[in-house]
């Protein structure tokens, strides 16, 4: 059996790994606001880095942690997630080996992984399609989400 593999951010890194290691089980890949981990790519902004450092140290400031839990987000897990992301290293060679139909979706205003991360991913995967969305950062904003989903469904229809 095979499936369309979709992942966003760290989930995109995981989806890339699945597509690389299990191409026979992957119908297609959608990598959203993710990265190859290449060290030459632009880093996050200083402000964003400071915010992540606060999360990593358990300083959630004015965040309503219970409300975040209701959305399925657990800020307490951020230190583990950040450790995994930063220790994943440069996966460019792995990403270059992806040989399934791929859509790369990325925000034009992503402060965590600037658009060059999406561009680099698309450049490495032969035949991939890249879409950069205005008004999207490192999130899935309600104003842009219908277009993201529509593009994804069109892509699946082509597969």
Give residue spans per PLM region.
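Alpha/beta-hydrolase fold nucleophile elbow
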Residues: 1-9
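Core-facing hydrophobic residues within beta-strands of well-ordered domains
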Residues: 26-27, 128
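Active-site nucleophile elbow and catalytic-triad environment of alpha/beta-hydrolase enzymes
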Residues: 78-94
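Short beta-strand/loop motif that positions the catalytic acidic residue
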Residues: 98, 104-106, 110
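Conserved alpha/beta-hydrolase "acid-adjacent" motif
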Residues: 111-117
């Amino acid at each position: 059996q095979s499936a369309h593999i979709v992942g966003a951010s760290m989930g995109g890194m995981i989806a890339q790994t699945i597509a690389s290691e299990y191409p026979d089980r992957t119908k297609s890949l959608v990598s959203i606001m993710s990265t190859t981990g290449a060290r030459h790519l632009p880093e996050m902004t200083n402000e964003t880095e400071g915010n992540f450092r606060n999360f990593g140290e358990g300083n959630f400031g004015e965040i309503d942690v219970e409300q975040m839990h209701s959305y399925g987000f657990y800020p307490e897990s951020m230190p583990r997630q950040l450790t995994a992301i930063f220790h994943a290293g440069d996966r460019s060679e792995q990403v270059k080996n992806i040989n399934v139909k791929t859509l790369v979706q990325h925000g034009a205003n992503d402060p965590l992984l600037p658009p060059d991360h999406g561009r680099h991913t698309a450049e490495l995967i032969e035949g991939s399609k890249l879409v950069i969305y205005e008004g999207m950062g490192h999130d899935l904003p309600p104003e842009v989400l219908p277009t993201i989903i529509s593009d994804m469904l069109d892509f699946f229809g082509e597969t």
